[in-house]
Amino acid sequence: MYKCSQGAMNTEKVMEKFVIQSRFREMYPDKAKAIAGMTVPARYADSVEDMVAFANEKIRVQKAKVEAEKNARQAMGAPAKFDKYGKYKY
């Protein structure tokens, strides 16, 4: 949780961040799924636009990892088939 310098919880800031995250989930459900379970850094949690930027970056990185794994498997001569979650199918 967000804490003040005295060690007490800043409830206004916590509620504000919660509202921002809720709006983000409502407005961009596909992007919210992409970053589900990830810890969003504080600098990205200040506005919906910042969270969209964070989600876009994470989606780009995930796509790059899948593409790199696909290329590596093709270079070895293995078939590069992935399921809808980006996991390799045997």
UniProtKB/Swiss-Prot annotation:
Top-level taxon: Viruses
Protein name in UniProt: Uncharacterized protein 045R
Species name: Invertebrate iridescent virus 3 (IIV-3)
